[in-house]
Amino acid sequence: MYVVLIAVFFLSMALVYCIPVSWIQGNVEKSLAVMKTEGERPMYAFYRHSAIVDNHTDMLMYESLIANRDYYNPIQASVSINQYPRYWHGYQVALRPLTVIFQVQELRYLGMLLFYLLFFWSAWLIAEKTRPVCAMFYVLTIASGYLVAVTTCFQYLTTFYVLFGAVIFLLSGYGTDRPLNLMLYFFVVGMVENFFDFLTYPIITLGIPLILLLWMRVRDERMDLPGNFIFMFKASVSWGLGYALTWVAKWGITVVVLGVRYFWRTMSVIQYRLQGSEEEPLDRIGTIQRNLKAWMNVQDAGIISWSRVVLVILVMALLLTVWKKLKDWQTISAYLPILFTASYPYIWYLVMSNHSQIHYWYTYRAQLVAMFGGLIFIQGILKEDSSETVHEREA
């Protein structure tokens, strides 16, 4: 499967670069003019860092549609992406053909329609395969990521498309006569995410499907803590291997097609991302604080403060515990891997601190995993009404 997908990624990129530049030149120039007028990082409606639209990266994506070296053949152009070869740039597979017909304004509209179609489809499946309240938590979680910005930015959209597709594929096959190979599933999701990703917030494509599976395993298989923890670990490793090995494959292809000098350039960037620099030293705790602040919309000297956020969360948790009562400890412990999965964004921030502290105004969306995990965990450990339990057993 790994070799097949790498071949598909490589060939699909090479094929779209066979499209003549003359077919897309006009729409590329008009689209770039629109985004330059808007500015590199416009803030629509909310005027908060949380709602920045990353036109800077979207303009880079459009500029990359046309190779800046005339002597490159389609394979070289598709690997180089204008001397930016460390990523796959999988968005080109859709963006380059569509730009033959459409400009950026039209593609934003089509992208928004596809986003909501996949979003509501995945939410409907969650309601059908789990419980309606889980679907409500899912909708609330995704909506907290400032969708007005997400649906107008191609860089933001691609990871959500992978997430929605992963959830739809998972739940469409869950409970059927042909069970999924879940470790292969997470491996492939990691590969596909890396094909499209710019280190935007890839962890959501692991965290949200994994949380759903951990919840369903307790409900359907009466899974205990060790069983769920081992499953969580294996699934996470599978996703991580798929993500990392797809990146390694791109670097290897780059060396073969363009030369070894590009490999050393990539290694220097990786070193910078992991260790920082004198101008931008790593501040791992500060990175987490920045991303939390952006996500919770905490403003300096504003109405929302850290103390108020924590107080509201504690009061709500206490009220729910008193009102609904907790399940037995064995059941509660089986749900604990969900809480561990909810911590994945913060592990990501600690590892990828340099990137996450610079681009916190969009990497904060990785914390959607924390929100969804927290809500699903609370739902799982609280006692249910007898009518809800009977209905769930009948379903």
Per-segment meaning from a language model:
Residues 93, 139-162, 190-195:
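Aromatic- and kink-enriched transmembrane "portal" helix at the membrane-lumen/periplasm boundary
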Residues 225, 319-343:
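Membrane-interface helix-loop-helix junctions at transmembrane boundaries of multi-pass membrane enzymes
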Residues 93-111:
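Juxtamembrane segments of multi-pass membrane glycosylation machinery
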Residues 182-209, 231-245:
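Membrane-interface alpha helices of multi-pass inner-membrane proteins
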Residues 171-182, 215-230, 324-329, 378-395:
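Membrane-interface junctions at the ends of membrane-embedded or membrane-associated helices
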Residues 112-135:
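Transmembrane-helix motifs of polytopic, lipid-linked glycan transferases
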Residues 358-381:
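Hydrophobic/aromatic-rich transmembrane helices and adjacent perimembrane loops
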Residues 232-317:
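Membrane-lumen/periplasm interface segments of specific transmembrane helices
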